[in-house]
C-alpha cells in the first residue's frame, strides 16, 4: 500500500478485509503510477534530472518518464515559456488523456522570472496557458522540493472525486488559454547608448549639504521611544 493516507481505507475487520470504494481504488492505482512528460527549457530541468540518480531514485514513486503526451498523465514544465512555444505546450497538454496534471517548476515557469520585466516574448506564468495543479517556486528548486511537490500531488489525487473530475472534463473548452496576451508595437527603448543625463548629473542633485545632514541627524537623536 502507499504511504498516502486515504479517508476511506481505514476500516478493517478482524479478518483483514479492506472496505473501500471504486473511486478510492482508482485514485490509489493512479497516484502510484504517474507517467510524467518532461517539458524542460532551462536550468530548472537539470535539478529534476538529479532525481534519476541513485541518491533520490524517483523510480520508487512509480514515475516512468514518457516521450509521448498520449502515454503521460503528468506534464512537468521547467524553465521559461515564450510566446512562440505556447501553442506547442498547449497542444501537448491537449493530447494527454484524462485525468492529467501539471506541475509548474521554477520561478520562470510560474511568473516569467527575470525575463518578465523587459522581455516582450515571455509568458508571464504558464497558468495563463494550461491549468496548474502544483506550484513549485525556486530558482532553481532543489530535488528535495521536487519530491515534496510530487508528494502533494499524490495527496491531491488520493482525495479526488469522480464527479468533480467529470465536471472538469465537461468544461474542457475553458481549461486552456485563459488569458490572451496582447502585443503592441512601440518605439524601441534599447538603443545601445547610455542616457547621458543619468551618468552626468549636476552636483546639486548628488551632494547633500552639511546643514541638511546635521539637521536630520539631530532630529533622529532627539526621538524617544514611548512604551
Swiss-Prot record:
PROSITE patterns: COMPLEX1_20K. This is NAD(P)H-quinone oxidoreductase subunit K, chloroplastic. Keywords: 4Fe-4S, Chloroplast, Iron, Iron-sulfur, Membrane, Metal-binding, NAD, NADP, Plastid, Plastoquinone, Quinone, Thylakoid, Translocase, Transport. One of its GO terms (biological process) is electron transport coupled proton transport. NCBIfam families: nuoB_fam (TIGR01957), PRK06411.1 (NF005012). It holds the Pfam family Oxidored_q6. [4Fe-4S] cluster binds at residues 43-44, 108, 139. It is an enzyme of class 7 (translocase).
Amino acid at each position: 500500500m502507499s504511504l498516502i493516507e486515504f479517508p476511506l481505507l481505514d476500516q478493517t475487520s478482524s479478518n483483514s478485509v479492506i472496505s473501500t470504494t471504486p473511486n478510492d481504488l482508482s485514485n490509489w492505482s493512479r497516484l502510484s503510477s504517474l507517467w510524467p512528460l518532461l517539458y524542460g527549457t532551462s536550468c530548472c530541468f537539470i535539478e529534476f534530472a538529479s532525481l534519476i540518480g541513485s541518491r533520490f531514485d524517483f523510480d520508487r514513486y512509480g514515475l516512468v518518464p514518457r516521450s509521448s503526451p498520449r502515454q503521460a498523465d503528468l506534464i512537468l514544465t521547467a524553465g521559461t515559456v515564450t510566446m512562440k512555444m505556447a501553442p506547442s505546450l498547449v497542444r501537448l497538454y491537449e493530447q494527454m488523456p484524462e485525468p492529467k496534471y501539471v506541475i509548474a517548476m521554477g520561478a520562470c515557469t510560474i511568473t516569467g522570472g527575470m525575463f518578465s520585466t523587459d522581455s516582450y516574448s515571455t509568458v508571464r506564468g504558464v497558468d495563463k496557458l494550461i491549468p496548474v495543479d502544483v506550484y513549485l517556486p525556486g530558482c532553481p528548486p532543489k530535488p528535495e522540493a521536487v519530491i515534496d511537490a510530487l508528494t502533494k500531488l499524490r495527496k491531491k489525487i488520493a482525495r479526488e472525486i469522480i464527479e468533480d473530475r467529470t465536471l472538469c472534463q465537461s468544461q474542457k473548452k475553458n481549461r486552456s488559454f485563459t488569458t490572451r496576451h496582447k502585443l503592441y508595437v512601440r518605439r524601441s527603448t534599447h538603443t545601445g547608448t547610455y542616457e547621458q543625463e543619468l551618468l552626468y548629473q549636476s552636483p546639486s542633485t548628488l551632494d547633500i549639504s552639511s546643514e541638511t545632514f546635521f539637521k536630520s541627524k539631530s532630529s533622529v537623536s532627539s526621538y524617544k521611544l514611548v512604551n
